[in-house]
């Protein structure tokens, strides 16, 4: 997508304590601010690395905060992602590509859709609607009719998101603009 960063995200069946022990074998710069969500971070050379245990979260309808439930499989973890374009994984050791929700096809086609019904996805985390708008404006994606309808019908759900998270997403949308070109 023409954007290189210095961060790597991993997901694993290892629990946070095990992940932290493994990371400490490679660096002393680790942090566990996301431990409650199953995430351990580390600085390895020039890379910021975050490793999160597979999750299969449960959400209360009046809150954006999930009840953290560790998952058992990669596929279960990927289905909880915001969009299919973010629901792909590469097994680091075997280099096996996992794309159970056709995210690569959606990238090539410039389509933004959710791994499961958008009403559930946006109910779980209403900020995803704002992320859809950002991906559309910055990366040139087109949302599916189902995603657009869910965004329209569920716009009021944004009210349960903290003002800080809304501000941060708006800042990303307005300040990090690049010309749309998801398939270039």
What residue ranges belong to the model's regions?
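Catalytic cores of the polymerase beta-like nucleotidyltransferase superfamily
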Residues: 1-182
């Amino acid at each position: 997508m023409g954007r290189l960063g210095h961060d790597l995200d991993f997901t694993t069946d290892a629990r946070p304590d095990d992940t932290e022990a493994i990371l400490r074998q490679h660096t002393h710069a680790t942090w566990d601010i996301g431990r409650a969500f199953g995430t351990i971070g580390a600085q390895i050379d020039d890379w910021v690395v975050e490793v999160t245990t597979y999750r299969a979260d449960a959400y209360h309808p009046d809150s954006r905060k999930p009840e953290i439930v560790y998952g058992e499989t990669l596929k279960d973890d990927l289905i909880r992602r915001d969009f299919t374009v973010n629901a792909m994984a590469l097994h680091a050791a075997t280099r096996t590509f996992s794309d159970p929700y056709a995210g690569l096809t959606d990238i090539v086609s410039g389509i933004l859709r959710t791994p499961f019904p958008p009403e559930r996805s946006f109910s779980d985390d209403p900020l995803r609607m704002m992320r859809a708008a950002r991906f559309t404006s910055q990366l040139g994606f087109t949302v599916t009719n189902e995603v657009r309808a869910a965004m329209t019908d569920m716009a009021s759900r944004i009210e349960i998101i903290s003002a800080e998270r809304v501000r941060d997403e708006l800042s990303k949308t307005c300040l990090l603009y690049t010309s749309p070109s998801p398939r270039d």
